[in-house]
């Protein structure tokens, strides 16, 4: 599998080492990974994610999203190898709208980062699955937690998503 185009573009945000691939081959579930991803890429923008997805689509390469690796579902396993997209560098709170009590964030923002950012506004993000999961990861798993009875799951907290396919 020739991934040199991505390696050239992403440079130090592109990894193929066994150590990095191994870190991205599992989550907190009981599932044992049988394969490693062929590469792990760390995009910073939606356009970069789109570039990775386009490359993978053109070359028939599986893509695996990776937030913080705290999920219990086993969905981050690279069953057929492929490219793991780690969203940790997509960690910006883009906008907070006090009047509407909503905000826009990138997928890699964690719940603790968001609540730290919101602390002085009087707002908070109520979904608490126990782990310091990323917002993107929580959306992908339908996260819930200790505040679900009062505030609902992630499903009730999300107004919209930008999805790149």
Where are these regions (language model features)?
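Beta-strand-loop-alpha "switch" segments that mediate conformational coupling across diverse proteins
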Residues: 137
């Amino acid at each position: 599998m020739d991934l040199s185009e991505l390696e050239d573009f992403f440079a130090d945000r592109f990894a193929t080492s066994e150590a990095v691939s191994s870190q991205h081959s599992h989550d907190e579930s009981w599932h044992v990974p049988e394969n490693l991803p062929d590469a792990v890429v760390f995009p910073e923008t939606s356009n970069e994610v789109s570039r990775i997805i386009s490359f993978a689509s053109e070359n028939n390469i599986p893509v695996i999203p990776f937030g913080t690796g705290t999920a219990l579902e086993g969905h981050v396993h690279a069953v057929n190898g492929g490219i793991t997209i780690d969203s940790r560098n997509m960690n910006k709170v883009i906008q907070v709208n006090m009047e509407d009590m909503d905000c826009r964030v990138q997928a890699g923002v964690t719940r603790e980062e968001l609540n730290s950012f919101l602390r002085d506004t009087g707002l908070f993000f109520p979904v608490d699955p126990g782990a310091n999961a990323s917002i993107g990861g929580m959306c992908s798993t339908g996260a819930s937690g200790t505040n679900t009875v009062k505030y609902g799951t992630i499903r009730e907290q999300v107004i919209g998503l930008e999805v790149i396919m």
